[in-house]
Amino acid sequence: MAEIAPLRVQLIAKTEFMAPPGVPWETDADGGEALTEFAGRACYQSWSKPNPKTATNAGYISHIIDVGHFSVLEHASVSFYISGISRSATHELIRHRHFSYSQLSQRYVPEHDSEVVVPPGFEDDPELVEIFTSAVDASRATYTELLKRLEAKFADQPNAVLRRKQARQAARAVLPNATETRIVVTGNYRAWRHFIAMRASEHADVEIRRLAIACLRELVTVAPAVFSDFVISTLADGSEVATSPLATEA
């Protein structure tokens, strides 16, 4: 029986900032938040912090977002390793073209023991889950049989790697959209804000909305000044959404 894969979002990289010598400026932040402030001040050479309301890093970034000077958010980035997400959801995820992706390859990785992601609409209904898992088991059995026959068909191919790849790329056609995949995603702060605004909305598919909420929780720990304007709330059906009055690029 297919194993269920839980969603997991792991922070694996974030921007480090190194202040250039000779610039008469200091800040109360570090990393990507410091870089964001530096980039903004570089536009106007406002190193002396003449405005008390923007003298702190948080105050400065809040002002930047409020006035829509989003380009300075593009310098800092965050990378996540995401697992427990379905192929169906990553087809939506990769539509965000300002992200960079590296995803598990079904041509090189055999999927006969792959886990699956239960669609949110099934989770609270044991009968639907049973129907779903039965269908998944049947498709995996078909995949395994096709893989075996295709490997035999391509047995004359002397390159073992190519032989296996040819078999897997054909057999994967019967795998369900619910098959778990794993993916590395890198994006700058502006791209992540746009993703959260679009996909943490109540109008988004529930699975990718859960991903957006999980990413937001990590992003707030990395750069609170950039992402803490998003507020997470719970809908009547128990699912979560995140909204911000400053998310104007959705």
UniProtKB/Swiss-Prot annotation:
The active site is at R199 (involved in ionization of n3 of dump, leading to its activation). Its EC number is 2.1.1.148. It catalyses: dUMP + (6R)-5,10-methylene-5,6,7,8-tetrahydrofolate + NADPH + H(+) = dTMP + (6S)-5,6,7,8-tetrahydrofolate + NADP(+). Disulfide bonds: none annotated. A motif (ThyX motif) lies at residues 95-105. Binds 4 FAD per tetramer. Each FAD binding site is formed by three monomers. It is an enzyme of class 2 (transferase). Pfam families: Thy1 (PF02511). FAD binds at S71, R95, H96, R97, Q103, N188, Y189, R190, H194. Residues 7-233 form the ThyX domain. DUMP binds at E92, L93, I94, R95, Q103, L104, S105, Q106, R107, R172, R199. The keyword Oxidoreductase does not apply. Belongs to the thymidylate synthase ThyX family. Homotetramer. Catalyzes the reductive methylation of 2'-deoxyuridine-5'-monophosphate (dUMP) to 2'-deoxythymidine-5'-monophosphate (dTMP) while utilizing 5,10-methylenetetrahydrofolate (mTHF) as the methyl donor, and NADPH and FADH(2) as the reductant. This is Flavin-dependent thymidylate synthase. The gene is thyX.
